[in-house]
């Protein structure tokens, strides 16, 4: 695949309308996420021809360019540097097309027409900003925990292990314990920042959920208070409560800042915000967040244990990826981790990627030997097997529509199997909140009966997704489809 170079970034910037059209440049694991002043100035046909670009996703809030893992972050850093140099006058920017009045009118009409959808997409897109920086840590902690559990089951249980082995296992587990002990604080920081507030205020509010309020407790950090002016404190809600506190806290902070004199902003804005939000958190958010958290856990535990529900979740997941709203599942992952000790939704959703691989392989065998389609599949199938599905989605199946549908069917079949096994008494899941998909996720799988049953069920589900995705596409997804 093409590398991200300064020339690539320069071409991308020019194709989206220049630095003056880019309000914000960020990234997630695989996408360069741009907030454009006018989406009408971005030329998608030009962007798709730039080496390294796998596809484009456009919404009212963000213009997303799919580049692949690693490359998205590199491109975002280079583009921000280029924009800074252009705006400071260090370089000359190529001439950009003048903003057409009709284009502006069309853009405004589009935004007004889809205002509700845009609001939902804007809200869910914030989750990418909150959780994407944490994903490498989730993966690292999950892998270390997986290896530690593997060593434990092979060399410790029913044996007399050496002290070195015990120390090694404890050492590999400590990172996961550290991550989950203070994860709420990291999320609070990112969440309040994502919604327009100060990250440190979000971290402080999140710490209210981490502190202990029982002076007799022998673990945790006692907060120094066991009630709030006569009201009992029950730090429930976990991630849901933290997100609510940070989101509302950001709005309160912005309102306070509007009326605060500039000279007093640094001193008083955070003080007032914390005093208000502390009370709101103790009295309202913790009780409500706790009930929402409990309800979400119950809903998805029942869906995951239901073969039909699991099939629907897996079958629709690719569609949520296309619309960029799949990050909305992340709070559910936290709820399941709290309720079960592992993330039972993740392996179900991962089946969608298996269906994608199977569908793409069917297209490969249906296409002629010299077809460009075969080259496209060859370049995207390895990332697909490793859990990076976007090259297959945007480069192979989605442009041809029918194979995308049959890929969803393949994913639904794998999801049905995972749900059926769970219904029969063996729920499986990821040993961390978030992790890689595809075959890379195998070492991270676990179950109530240990890691080996979890790994075997996940592999069987993937194979079913591959096979059903392949057969559905081979026999039903290639008619009247461009295979050139």
UniProtKB/Swiss-Prot annotation:
It is found in: Cell inner membrane. It catalyses: N-acetyl-beta-D-muramate(out) + N(pros)-phospho-L-histidyl-[protein] = N-acetyl-beta-D-muramate 6-phosphate(in) + L-histidyl-[protein]. Gene3D superfamilies: Glucose permease domain IIB. GO terms for cellular component: plasma membrane. Its EC number is 2.7.1.192. Disulfide bonds: none annotated. Residues 1-89 form the PTS EIIB type-1 domain. InterPro entries: Glu_permease_IIB (IPR036878), PTrfase_EIIB_Cys (IPR018113), PTS_EIIC (IPR003352), PTS_EIIC_1 (IPR013013), PTS_IIB_1 (IPR001996), PTS_Sugar-Specific_Components (IPR050558). The active site is at residue 28. One of its GO terms (biological process) is phosphoenolpyruvate-dependent sugar phosphotransferase system. It comes from the Bacteria. Keywords: Cell inner membrane, Cell membrane, Kinase, Membrane, Phosphotransferase system, Sugar transport, Transferase, Transmembrane, Transmembrane helix, Transport. The EIIB domain is phosphorylated by phospho-EIIA on a cysteinyl or histidyl residue, depending on the transported sugar. Then, it transfers the phosphoryl group to the sugar substrate concomitantly with the sugar uptake processed by the EIIC domain. This is PTS system N-acetylmuramic acid-specific EIIBC component. It comes from Vibrio parahaemolyticus serotype O3:K6 (strain RIMD 2210633). The lineage of its organism: Bacteria, Pseudomonadati, Pseudomonadota, Gammaproteobacteria, Vibrionales. The gene is murP.
């Amino acid at each position: 695949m093409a590398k991200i170079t300064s020339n690539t970034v320069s071409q991308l910037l020019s194709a989206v309308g220049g630095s003056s059209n880019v309000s914000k440049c960020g990234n997630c694991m695989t996408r360069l996420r741009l907030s454009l002043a006018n989406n009408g100035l971005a030329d998608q046909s030009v962007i798709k021809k730039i080496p390294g670009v796998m596809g484009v996703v456009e919404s009212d809030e963000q213009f997303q360019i799919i580049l692949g893992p690693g490359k998205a972050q590199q491109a975002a850093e280079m583009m921000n540097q280029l924009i800074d140099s252009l705006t400071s006058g260090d370089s000359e920017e190529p001439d950009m097309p003048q903003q057409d009045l009709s284009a502006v009118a069309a853009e405004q009409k589009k935004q007004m027409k889809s205002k509700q959808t845009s609001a939902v997409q804007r809200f869910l897109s914030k989750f990418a900003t909150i959780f994407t920086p944490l994903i490498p840590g989730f993966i690292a902690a999950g892998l270390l925990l997986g290896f530690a559990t593997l060593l434990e089951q092979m060399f410790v249980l029913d044996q007399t292990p050496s002290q070195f082995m015990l120390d090694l296992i404890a050492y590999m587990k400590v990172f996961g314990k550290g991550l989950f002990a203070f994860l709420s604080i990291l999320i609070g920081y990112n969440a309040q920042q994502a919604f327009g507030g100060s990250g440190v205020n979000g971290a402080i509010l999140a710490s209210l959920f981490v502190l202990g309020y029982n002076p007799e407790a022998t673990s945790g950090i006692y907060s120094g208070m066991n009630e709030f002016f006569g009201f009992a404190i029950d730090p429930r809600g976990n991630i849901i409560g933290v997100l609510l506190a940070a989101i509302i806290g950001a709005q309160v902070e912005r309102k306070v800042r509007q009326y605060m004199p500039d000279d007093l902003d640094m001193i008083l804005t955070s003080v007032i915000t914390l005093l208000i939000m502390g009370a709101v958190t103790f009295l309202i958010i913790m009780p409500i967040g706790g009930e929402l958290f409990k309800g979400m856990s119950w809903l998805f535990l029942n869906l995951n244990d239901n073969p039909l529900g699991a099939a629907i979740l897996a079958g629709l997941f690719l569609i949520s990826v296309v619309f960029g709203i799949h990050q909305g599942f992340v709070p559910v992952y936290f709820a399941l981790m709290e309720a079960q000790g592992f993330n039972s939704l993740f392996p179900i959703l991962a089946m969608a990627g298996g269906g994608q691989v199977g569908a793409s392989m069917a297209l490969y065998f249906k296409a002629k030997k010299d077809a460009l389609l075969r080259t496209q599949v060859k370049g995207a199938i390895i990332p697909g097997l490793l859990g990076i599905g976007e090259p297959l989605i945007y480069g192979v199946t989605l442009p041809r529509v029918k194979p995308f549908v049959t890929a969803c069917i393949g994913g639904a079949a794998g999801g049905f199997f995972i749900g059926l096994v769970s219904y029969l008494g063996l729920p499986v899941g990821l040993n961390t909140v978030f992790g890689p998909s595809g075959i890379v996720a195998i070492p991270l799988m676990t179950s109530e009966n240990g890691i080996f049953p979890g790994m075997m069920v996940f592999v069987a589900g993937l194979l079913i997704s591959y096979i059903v995705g392949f057969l559905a596409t081979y026999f039903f997804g290639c008619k009247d489809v461009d295979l050139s």
